[in-house]
Amino acid sequence: MAKLDANSEFEKGRALSVPVVKVPRSVKEWLCIDRAYENGNFKIEPMTGEAMYDQSYMFEDINYVNKDTAKKDSTLLEIMTLLKSLDGPFKITLANEQRDLDSFVNEIFNPINGQEYPVIEKGIGKWINQKIDEGTRDIRKTMILTVTCRAHSLEEAEAYFATIDTTLSNIFRNLRSRIYKMSAEERMVLLSRMLRAGEECLPPARISPHDSGWKNQILPASIQSDTDYMVINNKQYISVLVGTAFGQSLSEDKVIHSLSDVLFPTYITIDMQRVPKNVIHDRLENAHANNERV
């Protein structure tokens, strides 16, 4: 027998978080983070009692870099499959970040050993020039996992994330990879890099859950919005695309690879929400009975 409320129960899994400010009146109010703690935990929603908290981790995924194209396409999906063992919602962000050219050259081409290894120095110099000509010099890939939970206090959220740390370590060990828990400073630098592409990004001087002044230190001076794009600091244009349904002919791994293998800054976020088995069963039962549109 079909369940009349199957669709509504299924859609509850896609509920949005409560914004800190319903209608932002300044750039500072635009960032939906209620409180930040030095250990890297962020309180996302403003209410007292049960609220949303999250924690971010960075992939130190050497294997991903070294894989061929076919393997790269499937690695992200393999990780997502394993992470389905987590109880709460999570998201994976694949960031193509713009970096400063001088920093890139200093990192790759260190002239200290130039006199000792002149042939190697010359070869690296040619390689750098080749990369500059190709236009790939200022893009780097970063993979971020953000885990979310609902808790009545910071202590309750920290206890949950402590168990998650062990689970994630085991998952990535099986993938022959590593994962690194990010501090508040590191998360803020990441946010700043996204909003101030190509500029030097420094962590806030002071981080306190009772002081939101850190937002002014990482956010741009101005954000203007138009119909289908935003302008940051009158020079950086941002467009946001949201995909909620995909044709069966599309291959997930190829879509992800195509969107991420580009020569300009992009941030691809894949949101995952666990749905109870009984809700999925009712939803499929209704679809089979053709009583609801799916």
Regions found by a protein language model. Name each.
Residues 1-294:
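Extended, folded cores of ATP/NTP-driven motor/assembly subunits in large transport
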